[in-house]
């Protein structure tokens, strides 16, 4: 009998390209039929066939409290009855701006938007407007949203400018983006030595979550900050994924680096569409209506999204919240590694706060090339075995995973036991 998931997927493909509204959801990387989810409670999600899973995707990061947290739901319900959107200032957007600037010391001012892509796109435009320069440096394997200038792959040689990695991106747009190797401070220094007076900004995921999880070296982050300062370039931390996920002060607080601009999404909206970018006052005052850099949005600062975001940001400030989140995420990683080792499976894992990476390799990778060398087919088999057992991981070997405050010790233990059984079956 055809499953409800399969029926929905077949129907979806009639009017939605690929049957999904974001490519990774189609399961093209791992194969099979995607899950259509209809309900989430705590650490669990239920698909259209009624099957429940322990969820390690968490809507790709926002659900740090788990699904349908009662305080967040109550805040949204209370806001909805007062109106869905005004296209005008509201008190809630002032409240969340105050709170964001309090929690992120590098931000003197902040502008709300509706997505992480909007946040990074706007921050880059602002950096170019502030410096009067055009060139942007990004790093291979880092994802900053789907705006044209960021859908770029590396050129053919060291310090070359980029080429489009998506159809529809003009070559001229990509040519103002330089793609370098993540965690290579010398290559970054060489780029500044050659092009320093043209570089408007460096944008980076301080912890990479879009080529699985890659931790930065402190030397790399320090070099980035020093080189931007010396050359008058803007350092942009893309904290859309890491913001309030790796710690209350985000990645910049964890690693002790002060960026000039920061972008946020995911956790700040508590599951609703909300993003933000902010930073130094002298840069932020270049944005319209104060300055010449234009940025706008009909739904920016939406009162329902800000209600969810405020409720979430208040709850994550509870004493011990991040210590507990980090401990349970580490317990998951350590347990999976121990299970794999027991059965002779090449496997490694690591976490930073509530983010984690799983790799079918002897050691955790530190670069994009090392990620590509991991055994993707082994991951795909693991993914489907765990899905069958009721444990939902990201449907791609190149995506980080997430643990929420709602995950219990029993949830973690159950996932480790399922992995142990799968690894044992490989003998």
From Swiss-Prot:
Known catalytic reactions? (S)-4-amino-5-oxopentanoate = 5-aminolevulinate
State its location(s): Cytoplasm
GO CC terms of this entry: cytoplasm
Pathway, according to UniProt? Porphyrin-containing compound metabolism; protoporphyrin-IX biosynthesis; 5-aminolevulinate from L-glutamyl-tRNA(Glu): step 2/2
Residues that the record marks as modified (N6-(pyridoxal phosphate)lysine) are 266
Q: From which domain of life does this come?
A: Bacteria
Q: Which cofactor does it need?
A: pyridoxal 5'-phosphate
Q: InterPro entries from the entry? A: 4pyrrol_synth_GluAld_NH2Trfase, Aminotrans_3, Aminotrans_3_PPA_site, PyrdxlP-dep_Trfase, PyrdxlP-dep_Trfase_major, PyrdxlP-dep_Trfase_small
Q: In which broad location class does this protein mainly occur, judging by the first location in its UniProt entry? A: cytoplasm
Keyword DNA damage part of the UniProt annotation: no
One GO BP annotation of this record: protoporphyrinogen IX biosynthetic process
Matching entries from Pfam families are given as: Aminotran_3
Q: Which UniProt keywords apply?
A: Cytoplasm, Isomerase, Porphyrin biosynthesis, Pyridoxal phosphate
Of which family is this protein a member? Belongs to the class-III pyridoxal-phosphate-dependent aminotransferase family. HemL subfamily.
Protein name (database record): Glutamate-1-semialdehyde 2,1-aminomutase
Query: Which species is this UniProt entry from?
Result: Dechloromonas aromatica (strain RCB)
């Amino acid at each position: 009998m055809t499953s409800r998931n399969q029926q929905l997927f077949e129907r979806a493909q009639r009017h939605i390209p690929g049957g999904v509204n974001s490519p990774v959801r189609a399961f093209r990387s791992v194969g099979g039929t995607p899950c259509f989810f209809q309900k989430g409670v705590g650490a669990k999600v239920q698909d259209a066939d009624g099957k429940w899973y322990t969820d390690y995707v968490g809507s790709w990061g926002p659900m740090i409290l788990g699904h349908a947290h009662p305080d967040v739901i109550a805040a949204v319900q209370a806001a909805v009855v007062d109106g869905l959107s005004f296209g005008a200032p509201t008190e809630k957007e002032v409240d969340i701006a105050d709170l964001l600037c309090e929690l992120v010391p590098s931000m003197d001012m902040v502008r709300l938007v509706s997505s992480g892509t909007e946040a990074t796109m706007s921050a880059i435009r602002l950096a170019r407007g502030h410096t009067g320069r055009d060139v942007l440096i990004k790093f291979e394997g880092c994802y900053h949203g789907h705006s044209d200038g960021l859908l770029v792959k590396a050129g053919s040689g060291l310090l070359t400018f980029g080429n489009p990695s998506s159809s529809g991106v003009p070559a001229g747009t990509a040519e103002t983006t330089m793609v370098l190797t993540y965690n290579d401070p010398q290559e970054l220094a060489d780029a500044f030595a050659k092009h320093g007076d043209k570089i408007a900004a460096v944008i980076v995921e301080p912890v990479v979550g879009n080529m699985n999880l890659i931790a930065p070296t402190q030397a790399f982050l320090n070099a980035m900050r020093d080189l931007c300062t010396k050359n008058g370039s803007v350092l942009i931390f893309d904290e859309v994924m890491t913001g309030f996920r790796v710690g209350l002060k985000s990645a910049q607080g964890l690693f002790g680096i002060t960026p000039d601009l920061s972008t946020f999404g995911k956790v700040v909206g508590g599951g609703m569409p909300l993003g933000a970018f902010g930073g130094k006052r002298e840069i932020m005052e270049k944005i319209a209506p104060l300055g010449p850099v234009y940025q706008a949005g009909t739904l920016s600062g939406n009162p329902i999204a800000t209600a969810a975001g405020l409720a979430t940001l208040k709850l994550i400030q509870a004493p011990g919240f991040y210590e507990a989140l980090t401990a349970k995420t580490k317990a998951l990683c350590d347990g999976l590694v121990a299970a794999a080792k027991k059965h002779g499976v090449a496997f490694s894992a690591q976490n930073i706060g509530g983010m984690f990476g799983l790799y079918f390799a002897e050691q955790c990778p530190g670069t994009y090339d090392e990620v590509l060398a991991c055994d993707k087919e082994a991951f795909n088999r693991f993914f489907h075995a765990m899905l069958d057992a009721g444990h939902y991981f990201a449907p791609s070997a190149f995506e980080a995973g997430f643990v929420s405050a709602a995950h219990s010790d029993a949830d973690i233990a159950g996932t480790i036991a399922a992995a142990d059984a799968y690894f044992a079956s490989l003998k």
